[in-house]
A protein has these predicted regions:
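Enzymes that bind and transform nitrogen-containing heteroaromatic metabolites
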Residues: 1-199
Length: 199
């Protein structure tokens, strides 16, 4: 059975995007909200270790609009070049009934997302991941949460309050008990907390 993790940047008040989908808060360190080099490397290493990433439409559109060619942009840093390569190479599944085509080592699923995630989880191989920097996967992850398919939650909490937007945790049908397995701090007051689902 493959492990499924939901990992995202989140505000201190629990949102993955501010109203209107605004992500200007999500980096956490500099005045431009860019992530620290240490945090960016953590996300890059996570992408490199992911056996399969699962994306909803919004996440796919955000990631595929930047990372496929980010390493060719003027001024791209070595870390951005490495992340772009890792992201292109990482196997991905996009769940959408409105997207017509996907590229970059990606497969499109238009049917029942929960059934397909359960099927993928039942296989063997590397860990499955909800998607690094998953800015639009709240709906997909929420469905997987309600179906009891998520094994681990990794919250990268940025010390900012946005007052509303897209919540990290959607409405659940029942309680989910978790066990803390890791905490780590990054520059700018960003805190990683990882929890495993108690089964």
């Amino acid at each position: 059975m493959r492990k499924l993790t939901f990992a995202m940047n989140v505000t201190l008040d629990g949102y993955i995007a501010a109203p209107g989908g605004d992500l200007g808060w999500s980096g956490g360190e500099g005045p431009d909200s860019s992530p620290s080099a240490e945090l960016f490397q953590w996300w890059s290493d996570r992408v490199d270790a992911t056996g399969l990433a699962l994306y909803g439409r919004k996440l796919w559109e955000a990631m595929s609009s930047h990372w496929p060619t980010a390493d060719k942009q003027p001024g791209a840093t070595p870390a951005e070049i490495e992340f772009a390569r890792r992201w292109r190479d990482m196997p991905k599944v996009v769940f959408s009934s409105t997207i017509g085509k996907v590229d970059w080592n990606t497969r499109l699923v238009t049917g029942d997302a929960v059934a397909e995630i359960a099927r993928l989880k039942a296989g063997d191989g590397g860990p499955m991941d909800g998607g690094p920097m998953d800015i639009g996967g709240a709906t997909l992850a929420g469905a997987a949460m309600r179906a009891g398919l998520i094994d681990e939650y990794a919250l990268v909490t940025v010390p900012v309050l946005v007052g509303g937007g897209t919540p990290f945790f959607t409405a659940l049908d029942s309680w989910v008990n978790l066990t803390l397995v890791e905490t780590r701090t990054f520059p700018g007051g960003v805190v990683l907390t990882r929890y495993e689902t108690r089964r």
